[in-house]
């Protein structure tokens, strides 16, 4: 395909135009009085959202250079969303401010590499200052405040705080669509996975259609069980203890399944067989998790363990196991806490190394089941458009709250960046273009607070001057127009979100400023459709 090339100022200005179009669409959503953006969908109803990354993803520009500029800023929003889960609008605004001010200086003759170096040094100092400012999240109310600001709804914030309080730091909070109206919180006790009993004959509670086994032995097998002769020696050992048995394996079929069912119906021996969750390597990993949690071993020929020679000490234990048609819950497994901690650490390392969103999500679920718990927030609304918008907001708010627990909180409303810059720049000693680069950062850090003020109908410059002279942590409450102690009032942002937004914006700004040429695909001219021939003497 033929290419077109632009150089120097033309190249940079083309990229800037694309960036501005994307950033201008995103920044109207910032702050408590930010507006929504409507996204057209090819199929179904339009989406209404105020989520920066969702808006950015939808923007596709026609001009090839502008398209590349928009794609670069999209990357800022996506990266911030991946790392911190929120702060995408702030990151986009910071990127726009850094690039705009930087290009002005490049056009005036500044060295782009010197500017880039100055920007990097300044951002590093401001990030350090943000970390010093950050206060640990100590109360459920602080989590609720963080989530409420992100979602723009105190009821949602309170529900998220309750969910995180229940499942703990390592827990997973998922958001699902519901057919009912309003919000609902569902908590899972213990480890739950999405596989139920193989046969309904295992049910012990006919009303609830559940098999509930107290203090059972748990046999974990990474293969199918079909022959009863392989299972019989172990069944006899378990029967002598008068304890029930739970079998988690790839499958139980044939005479092995028939033997278990017949003994259950006769009341001779209580048991339940469950298919192992997942497939392939993921199944192997989940079975390993269950084994560690319950203090058992995975019976697999890979490690030299055969079913027919399995002893009781290789089986797991738990206080209770509840099995329904679709899922199994293990309550209070008897695993060694040190081994569980080791497994948790191993999964964390895998999460850090993984570059696949899907794998990370699955690893996070495994981590939650081992170390925390799982809470599901069910969302209902009057229309599908409202439902999707609400779900979006709640997902952002959950990420925000988790980020706050991770690295602490700072004053919200763009104030933390502005006040961190005041302290950071006192210690900076740069000269020439590097000093100019640092000054670009100082000016850009005013952009979020100015935009919040603008969206609230206030004059940004006046607000910035006022906030500069206030004590640390004090700033504008844009919802009321008053200047208050933001942390005490609950107007807070996670330090991780604020820091990630700044670092990702600076990274892309450096690339913009040091660009000397842009190579893009030449747009294809669509030929006019051929005019159909005349119909002649046709009768209709």
UniProtKB/Swiss-Prot annotation:
It is found in: Cytoplasm. It catalyses: ATP + H2O + a folded polypeptide = ADP + phosphate + an unfolded polypeptide. One of its GO terms (biological process) is protein refolding. Its EC number is 5.6.1.7. Keywords: ATP-binding, Chaperone, Cytoplasm, Isomerase, Nucleotide-binding. One of its GO terms (cellular component) is cytoplasm. Signal peptide: none annotated. CDD domains: GroEL. One of its GO terms (molecular function) is unfolded protein binding. ATP binds at residues 29-32, 86-90, 413, 477-479, 493. Its main location: cytoplasm. Coiled coil: none annotated. It is an enzyme of class 5 (isomerase). The keyword Cytoplasm applies. Pfam families: Cpn60_TCP1. Together with its co-chaperonin GroES, plays an essential role in assisting protein folding. The GroEL-GroES system forms a nano-cage that allows encapsulation of the non-native substrate proteins and provides a physical environment optimized to promote and accelerate protein folding. HAMAP family: CH60 (MF_00600). Forms a cylinder of 14 subunits composed of two heptameric rings stacked back-to-back. Interacts with the co-chaperonin GroES. NCBIfam families: GroEL, PRK00013.1, PRK12849.1, PRK12850.1, PRK12851.1. Belongs to the chaperonin (HSP60) family. This is Chaperonin GroEL 4. It comes from Frankia alni (strain DSM 45986 / CECT 9034 / ACN14a).
């Amino acid at each position: 395909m033929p290419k077109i090339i632009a150089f120097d100022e033309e190249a940079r200005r083309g990229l800037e135009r694309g960036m501005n179009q994307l950033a201008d669409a995103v920044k109207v959503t910032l702050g408590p009085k930010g507006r929504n953006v409507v996204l057209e969908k090819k199929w179904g109803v339009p989406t209404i959202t105020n989520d920066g990354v969702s808006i950015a993803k939808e923007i596709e520009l026609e001009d090839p250079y502008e398209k590349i500029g928009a794609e670069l800023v999209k990357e800022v929003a996506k990266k911030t969303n991946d790392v911190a889960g929120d702060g995408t609008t702030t990151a986009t605004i910071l990127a726009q401010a850094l690039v705009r001010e930087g290009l002005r200086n490049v056009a005036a003759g500044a060295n782009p590499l010197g500017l880039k170096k100055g920007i990097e040094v300044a951002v590093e100092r401001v990030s350090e200052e943000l970390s010093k400012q950050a206060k640990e999240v100590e109360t459920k109310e602080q989590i609720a405040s963080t989530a409420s600001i992100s979602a723009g709804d105190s009821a949602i914030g309170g529900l998220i705080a309750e969910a995180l309080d229940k499942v703990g730091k390592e827990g997973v909070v998922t958001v699902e669509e519901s057919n009912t109206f309003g919000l609902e919180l569902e908590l899972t006790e213990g480890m739950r996975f999405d596989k139920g009993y193989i046969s309904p004959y295992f049910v012990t509670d006919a009303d609830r259609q559940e098999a509930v086994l107290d203090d059972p032995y748990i046999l974990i097998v990474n293969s199918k069980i079909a022959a009863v002769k392989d299972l019989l020696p172990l069944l006899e050992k378990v029967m002598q203890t008068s304890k029930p048995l739970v079998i988690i394996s790839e499958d139980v079929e044939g005479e092995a399944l028939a033997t278990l069912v017949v003994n259950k119906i006769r009341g001779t021996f209580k048991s339940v067989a469950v298919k192992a969750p997942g497939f392939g390597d993921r199944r192997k990993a989940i079975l390993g998790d269950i084994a560690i949690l319950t203090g058992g071993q995975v019976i697999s020929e890979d490690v030299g363990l055969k079913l027919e020679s399995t002893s009781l000490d290789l089986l797991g234990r738990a206080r209770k196991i509840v099995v329904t048609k679709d899922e199994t819950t293990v309550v209070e497994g008897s695993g060694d806490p040190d081994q569980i901690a080791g497994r948790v650490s191993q999964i964390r390392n895998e999460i850090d190394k993984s570059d696949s969103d899907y794998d990370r999500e699955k690893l996070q679920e495994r981590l939650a089941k081992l170390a925390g718990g799982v809470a599901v927030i069910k969302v209902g609304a009057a229309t599908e458009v409202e439902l999707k918008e609400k779900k979006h907001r709640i997902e952002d708010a959950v990420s925000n709250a988790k980020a706050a627990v991770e690295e602490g909180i700072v004053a919200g409303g763009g104030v933390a960046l502005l006040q961190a810059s005041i302290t950071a720049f006192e210690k900076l000693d740069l000269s020439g273009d590097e000093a100019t680069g640092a000054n670009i950062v100082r000016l850009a850090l005013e952009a979020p607070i100015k935009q919040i003020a603008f969206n609230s109908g206030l004059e940004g410059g006046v607000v910035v001057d006022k906030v500069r002279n206030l004590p640390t942590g004090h700033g504008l409450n844009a919802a009321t127009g008053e200047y208050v102690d933001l942390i005490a009032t609950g107007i807070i942002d996670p330090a991780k979100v604020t820091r990630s937004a700044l670092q990702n914006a600076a990274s892309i700004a450096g690339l913009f400023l040091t660009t000397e040429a842009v190579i893009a695909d030449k747009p294809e001219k669509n030929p006019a459709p051929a005019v159909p021939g005349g119909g002649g003497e046709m009768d209709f």
